[in-house]
Amino acid sequence: MKLPIYFDYAATTPVDPRVAQKMMQYMTMDGIFGNPASRSHRYGWQAEEAVDVARSQVADLINADHREIVFTSGATESNNLAIKGVAHFYQKKGKHIITSKTEHKAVLDTCRQLEREGFEVTYLEPGVNGIIPMERLEAAMRDDTILLSLMHVNNEIGVVHDIDAIGELCRSKGIIFHVDAAQSAGKLPIDVQITKVDLMSISGHKMYGPKGIGALYVRRKPRIRLESQMHGGGHERGMRSGTLATHQIVGLGEAAAIAKADMESDNARIHALRDRLWNGIKDIEETYVNGDFEQRYCGNLNVSFNFVEGESLMMALKDLAVSSGSACTSASLEPSYVLRALGLSDEMAHSSIRFSIGRFTTEEEVDYAIGIIQGSIGKLREMSPLWEMFKDGVDLSKVEWVHH
């Protein structure tokens, strides 16, 4: 068993060996290395054909038409293109956008930029379970609302939004619906023929594909228009200029094909491992799951261990590669804004750890993790005066602390 054990699949996944093997055929002189836009020779034709195959593989994953897939550098770019692209194109119709407080920074910061440009954004509060209540969503919709941007699966707490119901609501109100599916594409079944999603962001490295590649699904019927954010040679039907990275696109396509074929068996395994991990630690006193436990992606377990300081817990768990928030904000010592939005205290948010399980996690690794967690929590609490006070029956919420 290799240490540290990787329990951070929500931050990134290793490239599946089958994907890496396929990508190797599209880089060197003895492979297919041509520019897919070169129409005058075989090198270009072969590369273009490889891109077409991959485009169909990504489309098949969500049951879309291959012409609805636009390749990007990843979900961050897809989110930017979707949100800014819609806002700029439809601004004469209205300048109001709805999103939630628990979105990824790639959505929140894009919305903040649009606010600086004169758009109005409503940031919805989730319920205590991390899910946006439908009535709260409907109440925020106005005549000048042009876009709703909402994640399918939350990257920190793994809760799943009902995009079928939300899509129906948006369609009935004439509001464009963008879904950030970075954490769900390739993990949960998605069918855009049934679900009324207009735009969907997809990430390669979250589903065992390479980093630096993603896609944006753009619905053709009813047609969704975007204003391009990247100008140049007019690639990707004018929506995203830039030479297509054949090897990465092939990697994304292969990862999508594998995800579609293995989704059911992968999820059954991951679900069993998640339950094994939770059953091994749930009896530790003052241990709580953050986010809805039922309406949740099975590979995510976000747990707060009360009366344990987050950073010391991370150090105690040095043999486990885990995180205390999203990878994009893990350098910050601030408590997770997602957990704060759920109403957790700073202390509880600070004592939370996200365990994310994936395709290559084993039972042996989960059992090893349980042992380390049980031992570490006990040791850290022995050193905590707060734990001692709590055990003595002191109500810590009523204690007045003196600042020196």
From Swiss-Prot:
UniProt EC number: 2.8.1.7
Function description: Master enzyme that delivers sulfur to a number of partners involved in Fe-S cluster assembly, tRNA modification or cofactor biosynthesis. Catalyzes the removal of elemental sulfur atoms from cysteine to produce alanine. Functions as a sulfur delivery protein for Fe-S cluster synthesis onto IscU, an Fe-S scaffold assembly protein, as well as other S acceptor proteins.
GO cellular component terms, A-Z: L-cysteine desulfurase complex
Binding of pyridoxal 5'-phosphate, residues: A75, T76, N155, Q183, S203, G204, H205, T243
Superkingdom of the source species: Bacteria
Obligatory cofactor(s): pyridoxal 5'-phosphate
Self-association state and partner proteins as the record states: Homodimer. Forms a heterotetramer with IscU, interacts with other sulfur acceptors.
UniProt-recorded Gene Ontology molecular function terms: 2 iron, 2 sulfur cluster binding; cysteine desulfurase activity; metal ion binding; pyridoxal phosphate binding
Pathway membership, UniProt: Cofactor biosynthesis; iron-sulfur cluster biosynthesis
Main location per the UniProt record: cytoplasm
UniProt keywords, alphabetically: 2Fe-2S, Cytoplasm, Iron, Iron-sulfur, Metal-binding, Pyridoxal phosphate, Transferase
Name the record gives this protein: Cysteine desulfurase IscS
Residues where [2Fe-2S] cluster binds: C328
Compartments, as annotated in UniProt: Cytoplasm
GO terms, biological process: [2Fe-2S] cluster assembly
Similarity annotation: Belongs to the class-V pyridoxal-phosphate-dependent aminotransferase family. NifS/IscS subfamily.
PANTHER family: CYSTEINE DESULFURASE, CYSTEINE DESULFURYLASE FAMILY MEMBER
Positions of post-translational N6-(pyridoxal phosphate)lysine modification: K206
Gene3D superfamilies for the chain: Aspartate Aminotransferase, domain 1, Type I PLP-dependent aspartate aminotransferase-like (Major domain)
Catalysed transformations (reactions): (sulfur carrier)-H + L-cysteine = (sulfur carrier)-SH + L-alanine
Catalytic machinery residues: C328 (cysteine persulfide intermediate)
